[in-house]
Amino acid sequence: MSGRSGNGGQQKMRIRPFMATIDEQYVTQTWELLKRAIQEIQRKNNSGLSFEELYRNAYTMVLHKHGERLYNGLKDVIQDHMASVRIRIIESMNSGSFLETVAESWADHTVAMVMIRDILMYMDRIYVAQNNHVLPVYNLGLDAYRTEILRQNGIGDRIRDALLELIKLDRKSNQINWHGIKNACDMLISLGIDSRTVYEDEFERPLLKETSDYYRDVCKNWLSGDNDACFYLAQVEIAMHDEASRASRYLDKMTEAKILQVMDDVMVAEHIQTIVYMQNGGVKFMLEHKKIEDLTRIFRIFKRIGDSVTVPGGGLKALLKAVSEYLNETGSNIVKNEDLLKNPVNFVNELLQLKDYFSSLLTTAFADDRDFKNRFQHDFETFLNSNRQSPEFVALYMDDMLRSGLKCVSDAEMDNKLDNVMILFRYLQEKDVFEKYFKQYLAKRLLLDKSCSDDVEKALLAKLKTECGCQFTQKLENMFRDKELWLTLATSFRDWREAQPTKMSIDISLRVLTAGVWPTVQCNPVVLPQELSVAYEMFTQYYTEKHTGRKLTINTLLGNADVKATFYPPPKASMSNEENGPGPSSSGESMKERKPEHKILQVNTHQMIILLQFNHHNRISCQQLMDELKIPERELKRNLQSLALGKASQRILVRKNKGKDAIDMSDEFAVNDNFQSKLTRVKVQMVTGKVESEPEIRETRQKVEDDRKLEVEAAIVRIMKARKKLNHNNLVAEVTQQLRHRFMPSPIIIKQRIETLIEREYLARDEHDHRAYQYIA
């Protein structure tokens, strides 16, 4: 039908067909038909049913407003059916087929409810959707099974007990039908209708409690007797793996995670201190015996243990504490070891081995964990710097390495060795102390030609420069520049002296050092032998002619010389009355003449000057040597001790006074005519060790402290010049930040240097705030 509106538009109207009403008898007949069909479906006799006809009948009832009757009727039919199913389940409760009966009834019920839902789909879509207080057809069936079966006559408790018993058998490696457990778990989850409550209440919580009790008993056995932490943790990991495999087969995924958490709590968290500190089997035992596999396992297990009252900070914190304690104990034993303190190379080697071990552990066992890495670095820094000689020892190790230790290694191995020792260098807090010693040893290597390779030296300098900046290596690089000039200087001097009328009787090489660059100790001028004096005067003349305005000051402390010596031994039967010296024979046996022995003695400059005196004296006292040569007393005694009291194979001189270790000024010395050596070239080593004595350490420390005062003052001036005004705390913080790569200045020293700068009028206190300072231009 169509019509026109007043404005000329068209309107379309749809007329619904007339819906005839149905009487009560028809409704009753329709319901009875549906009821019988539902019951047949529940009995699994649905082959003769017409689902299309049944759907139309249900549709008609809902369409004519009889949905409530249909819904309530369905509810009654389901409850009646559940009652009959319950009887069958109760009868099987004491038989071995209980779980199978439950599973079968559940499967039949869910299949039937799917079919019933399809028949009553229109009721779900219309009646159920319009009434919020009723459940959809399928969920109605689930609710009925839960209330009429699961929670009746102890059926739910019996299901739980049966499941727990099967799981207990499975844990004891008995064969079970795990499919039955999985089906029961799936059923309990489905009965929750979009919630895990039923599953959790009926099964999961009891399972977790039973798991906790079971493994608590198991742990007691594993921790008893002679079992150690390595055995215990291996058993824990096996149990965790088995339980995870078991859970993945027939338990819910969320339950698997909860079970593993319970096991972590019961098996690890509750015993964590016992595991870590177990006597002859804990973390210390693993570290001492390099049990890498066990350390990897304990890290893997402890990583799962979170922060709790039982384990504050978590499992890794407890593990890290124990590992750190071992590292500190081992490192402290190294830096305090009396034998190692006498041998700096072994001292550093032990530390490097410890560092390599823990670096390897960090990668292989501890998964490069950042907290472990930071703690290891902190611990190394702590115990390394607890020994104030560490900077000296690291410098000595580098010195030994750069002399001859790297000649037989490849470039890659050399670079690896340098990188390793640079790691220890980074841990040093007093890098300025290291620098002072390193300069001394570098100077000796360069001056005495003891360096294995200039390339290796420069490679190390490059690493130091990268680590500490160009200011740290500036003077070191200048020392190498001086060395490069020596060759040119030596060649031109040789050409110059060839043209001179005065000829030198000795071959001499003089090296010019830039003042302020080389860490040499100034020595008072000594009296040089005539040959040396002439050579020095010629070189001075040559150098001052070539470099106008420069002044040369001779320093004999770091020189060396080859001295030709001839020893005239007495007859073989003669006996000595002195320390390794000659004397008249005390026996009547025949004398056998011995040939003179010609040697080349490799000595330092002062030793050479001392030895040349014996060309003019048969014997001479220490006092006389000092008077004639002007060598300082301490230096003179050191060299005499090396020449007369050193190794037997190096005793060029003999002392006339026997028995004393220390040399007195009255002691007299003579040439040791009995001196013998298989070597033609004999190198005389200084008796004093490489490590500084206590007075030398104090002297070096004092020099370092004096240098630090200047560095602190320079840093204060730099900062204040840039900031103009700054309060005390901020100034201290900035000075510390600037200098920490060389040393850690104490607030007291900084305050003292501030006061000095105020007195010298570089700074002034602020008039309004006496805790603040102003820079005075």
UniProtKB/Swiss-Prot annotation:
Probable core component of multiple cullin-RING-based BCB (BTB-CUL3-BTB) E3 ubiquitin-protein ligase complexes which mediate the ubiquitination and subsequent proteasomal degradation of target proteins. Probably acts as a scaffold protein which may contribute to catalysis through positioning of the substrate and the ubiquitin-conjugating enzyme. Required to target mei-3/katanin for degradation at the meiosis to mitosis transition via its neddylation and deneddylation. Functions in ubiquitin-mediated degradation of CKIs to target cki-1 for degradation. GO terms for cellular component: Cul3-RING ubiquitin ligase complex; cytoplasm; nucleus. Residues 568-596 are annotated as: Disordered. It is found in: Cytoplasm; Nucleus. Keywords: Cytoplasm, Isopeptide bond, Nucleus, Ubl conjugation, Ubl conjugation pathway. InterPro entries: Cullin (IPR045093), Cullin_CS (IPR016157), Cullin_homology (IPR016158), Cullin_homology_sf (IPR036317), Cullin_N (IPR001373), Cullin_neddylation_domain (IPR019559), Cullin_repeat-like_dom_sf (IPR016159), WH-like_DNA-bd_sf (IPR036388). Residues 576-589 have a biased composition (Low complexity). There is a cross-link at residue 721 (Glycyl lysine isopeptide (Lys-Gly) (interchain with G-Cter in NEDD8)). Disruption phenotype: RNAi-mediated knockdown at L1 larval stage results in the disorganization of myosin thick filaments in adult body wall muscles characterized by the formation of abnormal myosin heavy chain myo-3 aggregates and V-shaped crossing of A-bands. RNAi-mediated knockdown suppresses the age-dependent paralysis and growth arrest induced by exogenous dipeptide repeat protein PR50. Pathway: Protein modification; protein ubiquitination. Gene3D superfamilies: Cullin Repeats (1.20.1310.10), Cullin, Chain C, Domain 2 (3.30.230.130), Winged helix-like DNA-binding domain superfamily/Winged helix DNA-binding domain (1.10.10.10). Neddylated. Deneddylated via its interaction with the COP9 signalosome (CSN) complex. Signal peptide: none annotated. It comes from the Eukaryota. One of its GO terms (biological process) is protein ubiquitination. GO terms for molecular function: POZ domain binding; ubiquitin protein ligase binding. This is Cullin-3.
